[in-house]
């Protein structure tokens, strides 16, 4: 039987823990206003800088801010609610934007998360010159790691982030990025194999001729070019990040993984993809690698959906500018898909990052 002093000691420890955790319990359940702030992060891959945003819970009333073609459901530079919160970093797809998933960011922030987005250099809506090169294929996860490090070192943000509760989310090439961060290892020679089998797949193989010409200009065959990228996997350090505890991957580019590479994932993954994805066909991507994921804790296949369903529901302005990424097949309601996706993402990160919630 425990002594009275030891029972009292445990009681005091429990009380102290309760007092420390109580604000987190409230924040995990409450829906708050959201603030966001523009950031600039040093890019260790290209040597320049990366723009992005940080979204965070705020006591300020909800509002909408117009940023380019995006209607962001957050107040610019609103004061944050104090206290350390879990962090999720979102990685966009090829040619994407640091605001392409702002609805997911604001949803998570309204439920107690800090969320960071970044614009990947040489692989964004105004510059895709790095696609097919090490700067992108290897550099992307390094840039996410740099974003995490910068926020944890910044006096403005470090006290708002729980360094032990960090997750990543990503779409398409951003989903690929997320998988690398939790341990996946790509085999880039699979690109060549894929394009031999699907030479008319413009979404994946459209740069093959350009890259072949570039390889020849350097005296390399395409096989040697790909081997060079494979050799660059550790050029900027490990692509995995032990600080990242979980990955939420939406329609991930995964045709360049083999079973051994996927088996190296050692943290929880939630996999989302569209049933009728015509950009990253499921049989060569998500559905193919799904059986190899030993740490898969959730999966959702969106019926009839194509690739672009994972982009936020578009504003009227963005729909006019880019109807391809803003359109869905008949029978697919992007707003409803995202409502479910946000609920799933929140539940996934709460569980895998061990965030306490009230009963």
Give the role of each language-model region.
Residues 267, 281-290, 314:
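Short alpha-helix in the alpha/beta-hydrolase fold that links the catalytic acid
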Residues 77-85, 90-127, 278-282:
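Short substrate-entry loop that stabilizes the transition state in hydrolases
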Residues 133-159, 194-210, 214-217, 233:
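Alpha/beta-hydrolase active-site loop
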Residues 271-273:
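Short beta-strand/loop motif that positions the catalytic acidic residue
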């Amino acid at each position: 039987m425990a002594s009275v002093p030891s029972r009292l000691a445990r009681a005091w420890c429990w009380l102290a823990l309760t007092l420390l955790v109580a604000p987190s319990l409230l924040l995990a359940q409450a829906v708050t206003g959201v603030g966001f702030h523009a950031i600039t992060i040093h890019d260790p891959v290209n040597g320049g800088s990366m723009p992005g945003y940080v979204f965070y819970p705020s006591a300020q009333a909800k509002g909408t801010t117009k940023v380019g073609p995006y209607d962001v459901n957050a107040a610019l530079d609103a004061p944050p609610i104090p206290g350390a919160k879990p962090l999720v970093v979102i990685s966009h797809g090829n040619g994407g934007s640091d605001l392409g998933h702002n609805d997911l960011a604001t949803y998570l922030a309204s439920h107690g998360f800090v969320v960071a987005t970044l614009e990947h250099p040489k692989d964004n809506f105004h510059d895709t010159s790095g696609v097919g090169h090490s700067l992108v294929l290897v550099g992307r996860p390094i840039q996410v790691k740099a974003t995490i490090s910068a926020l944890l070192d910044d006096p403005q943000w470090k006290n708002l982030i729980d360094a032990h509760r960090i997750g990543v989310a990503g779409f398409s090439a951003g989903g690929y990025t997320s998988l690398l961060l939790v341990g996946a290892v790509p085999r880039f020679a699979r690109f060549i194999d894929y394009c031999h089998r699907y030479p008319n797949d413009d979404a994946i193989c459209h740069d093959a001729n350009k890259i072949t010409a570039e390889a020849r200009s350097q005296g390399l065959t395409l096989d040697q070019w790909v081997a060079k990228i494979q050799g660059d996997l550790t050029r900027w350090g490990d692509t995995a990040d032990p600080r990242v505890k979980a990955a939420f991957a939406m329609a991930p580019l995964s045709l360049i993984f083999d079973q051994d590479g996927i088996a190296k994932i050692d943290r929880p993954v939630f996999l989302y993809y569209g049933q009728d994805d015509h950009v990253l066909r499921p049989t060569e991507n998500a559905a193919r690698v799904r059986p190899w994921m030993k740490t898969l804790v959730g999966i959702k296949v969106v019926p009839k959906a194509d690739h672009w369903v994972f982009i936020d529901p578009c504003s009227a302005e963005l729909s006019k500018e880019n109807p391809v990424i803003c359109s869905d097949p008949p029978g697919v309601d992007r707003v409803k898909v995202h409502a479910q996706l946000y609920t799933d993402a929140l539940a996934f990160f709460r569980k895998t990052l061990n965030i306490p919630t009230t009963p």
